[in-house]
Regions:
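Conserved proline-anchored active-site loop of SAM-dependent methyltransferases
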Residues: 12-14, 86-87
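Short, charged, surface-exposed loops that flank catalytic or proteolytic processing sites
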Residues: 14-20
């Protein structure tokens, strides 16, 4: 659950938002009551999650990923391997469920039961890698 979402929902609903700056300002206003030492970090994380949710919705990312996972077996030759990178838990759940179902149906001969995460070194070199998860599957012969 998103912290303080009710306050934001009311402000967003009652405002005309036509720029990302206005949306960020509304988020800042709704979180103005927070203690100063926590405020900056919470605002940053809230903005990240809000903009991510908008991007996912606008780009139909779940629908596209679902369609990709449905078509993936047809794109792999027997013994072919696929690796899928996900960047948030919703994507990862969808991929995990699809690979598991494909394995149970005999479409995949093997798949990653556990997620593969980037190393600490990789995250240090590329901060954006920290939320990445990888899962894989092998097309049945």
């Amino acid at each position: 659950h998103e912290p303080y979402r009710r306050q934001r929902q009311m402000c967003i609903r009652d405002s005309r938002i036509d720029t990302t700056t206005k949306l960020r300002h509304i988020i800042e206003q709704t979180l103005d009551f927070l203690h100063e030492k926590d405020k900056k970090d919470i605002i940053k994380k809230t903005c990240q999650r809000t903009f991510q949710a908008l991007r996912i919705d606008v780009n139909h990312e779940f629908e596209v990923l679902y369609e990709f996972m449905e078509k993936l077996p047809g794109a792999l030759k027997p013994g072919g391997r696929a690796a899928i990178l996900t960047f948030h838990s919703g994507e990862d759940k969808l991929v995990k469920k699809a690979l598991k179902a494909g394995y149970k149906a005999g479409i995949y001969s093997d798949y990653s039961k556990d997620v593969i995460r980037p190393s600490a070194q990789e995250c240090a070199q590329n901060g954006r890698a920290r939320s990445t998860k990888m899962r894989w599957a092998v097309r049945a012969e």
